[in-house]
Amino acid sequence: MSSRSRSKTRESRALGIALTPKAARYMEKRPYAPGEHGRTKRKADSDYAVRLREKQRLRAQYGILEKQLRIAFEEARRTQGLTGENLVEILEMRLDALVLRAGFARTISQARQFVVHRHILVDGKLVDRPSFRVKPGQTIGVKARSEGTEPFQVAAAGGHVDVLPKTPAYLSVELDKLQARLERRPKRAEVPVTCEVQLVVEYYAAR
């Protein structure tokens, strides 16, 4: 296991969620936090620790920096509706998140790399910012010169289907063509992230 894989696995165990397929397999064998040995009971966390861990869970699943999450939270708070639901919906419209949901990548880290390395198109134009906000009606695709490379051939053949959640209803995908379209704004209940968003709201509200 590479040092990066070990790091993600350890982070997954600490947060109680699998951030990568490899971490998911590891956690099936060792379903307890790092440093624990499966038999000792974990001391009850404080309210602050619970909120902090939930915030860290959300941040880790999107692979973003604290500053990026804070900016998204402030936007969510200004938007009409429930702040927590708005927050997840805003994050879900990031380009790297949708590249992952479409099945073009195996992990959020790989999805981000694809965007940064200029493999991904939005409405036929190259976009190299993972944080790019995709709008309903816009299409996501792979650059023609990149389609024949091994990572995208694996994706087009459905190589990640078994390790990713089912494609959500707000996204239509033609995987064999490496094409996807954001049909509408995501709804929190449809977004496949593990997070008690109200605790995230409480965390930021207290700071």
Curated annotation (Swiss-Prot):
**Pfam short name (any one):** Ribosomal_S4
Q: Which residues form a coiled coil?
A: none
User: What are the GO BP annotations of this UniProt entry?
Assistant: ribosomal small subunit biogenesis; translation
- Identify one Gene Ontology CC term for this UniProt entry: small ribosomal subunit
Q: Which GO terms describe its molecular function?
A: rRNA binding; structural constituent of ribosome
Q: Can you tell which superkingdom this protein's organism belongs to?
A: Bacteria
The record's section on InterPro entries has: Ribosomal_uS4 (IPR022801), Ribosomal_uS4_bac-type (IPR005709), Ribosomal_uS4_CS (IPR018079), Ribosomal_uS4_N (IPR001912), S4_RNA-bd (IPR002942), S4_RNA-bd_sf (IPR036986)
Entry keyword annotation includes Repressor? no
Domain named S4 RNA-binding: residues: 93-158
Q: Does the keyword Metal-binding apply?
A: no
Alphabetically list the UniProt keywords. Answer: Ribonucleoprotein, Ribosomal protein, RNA-binding, rRNA-binding
Region Disordered, residue ranges: 20-45
Q: What is its quaternary makeup? A: Part of the 30S ribosomal subunit. Contacts protein S5. The interaction surface between S4 and S5 is involved in control of translational fidelity.
- What is the annotated role of this protein in its UniProt record? One of the primary rRNA binding proteins, it binds directly to 16S rRNA where it nucleates assembly of the body of the 30S subunit. With S5 and S12 plays an important role in translational accuracy.
Membership in a protein family: Belongs to the universal ribosomal protein uS4 family.
This one is known as Small ribosomal subunit protein uS4
Q: Which organism is it from?
A: Leifsonia xyli subsp. xyli (strain CTCB07)
Where is the organism placed in the taxonomic lineage, from the top? Answer: Bacteria, Bacillati, Actinomycetota, Actinomycetes, Micrococcales
The gene behind this protein is: rpsD
